[in-house]
Amino acid sequence: MVHKSPPSRRACRKYGGVFDVAAYEARIATLEAAAAAPDFWSERARAEALLAELKTLRATLEPWRALRRESADLRALYELAREAQDASLEPELSSLFSDISARFEEASLTRLLHEEVDRLDAFVTIHSGAGGVEACDWAQMLMRMYTRWAERRSFCVHIVDLLESEGGVKSVTLKICGSHAFGFLKGETGVHRLVRISPFDSAARRHTSFTSTYVFPVLDDHVEVHIRSEDMRVDTYRSGGAGGQHVNKTDSAVRITHLPTGIVVTCQNERSQISNRATALSLLRARLYAYERQKKQQEHQRFASEKKDISWGNQIRSYVFHPYTMVKDHRSKCETGNIHAVMDGALEPFIRSYLEFLCTSTQCVEPQ
């Protein structure tokens, strides 16, 4: 017989210790009452924001409700089978247990996300740093890693801006669309260090390369970021490309400079200048939001200038291919020897360990 049992109430307390079901239910009831009011749509922006919050709260709470019901049912079935010594139910019990356990892990990961913007899509910007051609190849490897992670979760990935270079990618901005994409990926911001035998070195020597990643939320309309038109300089230019029939023969690429902060964003991968401008503005809003958050937290790193030294001493994670294989996060201390799985998008252990690390160092706030 199967000796495993579904996630226990003790396990639920372990992973959901800061998850107050009653607080969620109370907030949902308050929002539902507000939505039923006759004058609810008198302020459209506020109404849409409340509905978005209601949708997020329901999506967060429902998996826990379902898990509680299904876990209780499975536990009852397990006890009956054990008392009757009925081994024929073992395959079904094992399958149900695996399914519930997987969804429990996903729900316990999501409950670590409490910031307003955690539910949003994400911009992921990657810049190659110290290491020359090797660093450009490393940036391309990280681009693939995040793309594979998104594909594993059935998220959509769109290239907003791409600057190719010899050996790989000089810089790239991805837009990753999916539930809580920003919340899951926000811990990827920082410098990533690669150690390997370089395929570009004929002497087969070991090289160290650095690449920086910056993750920003794709803000929706209810997150206020005010940008004055006089504070922006908009430049258009011809999109780059590999040549052939897809080369853009018009000045459709857009570069926007925010004059007060010096933040520069570009977009060249949409089909028209209008679309490129809209995407660039969305990216600028995200960058300014992150910039203001950094100022409020009184941190020294500035997302605007992106001048943090992409080299020794600043890395958040190391990826070692030689003389041994290991990926180690220097903040949460999470590590694994299966580096190839990580490079193929298996980031969940690092995402979870960082969010748990973040939750122990900050106060997680439940709905009010």
Curated annotation (Swiss-Prot):
Modified residues (N5-methylglutamine): 245
GO cellular component: cytoplasm
PTM section of the record: Methylated by PrmC. Methylation increases the termination efficiency of RF2.
Gene3D superfamilies assigned to the protein according to its UniProt record, in alphabetical order: 3.30.160.20, 3.30.70.1660, Release factor (1.20.58.410)
Keywords carried by this UniProt record: Cytoplasm, Methylation, Protein biosynthesis
Residues that span the membrane, as ranges: none
SMART domains: PCRF (SM00937)
Single annotated GO MF: translation release factor activity, codon specific
Top-level taxon of the source organism: Bacteria
Locations listed in the record: Cytoplasm
Homology family: Belongs to the prokaryotic/mitochondrial release factor family.
Xref: HAMAP family: Rel_fac_2 (MF_00094)
Role of this protein: Peptide chain release factor 2 directs the termination of translation in response to the peptide chain termination codons UGA and UAA.
Protein name per UniProt: Peptide chain release factor 2
Source species taxonomy: Bacteria, Pseudomonadati, Spirochaetota, Spirochaetia, Spirochaetales
Gene: prfB
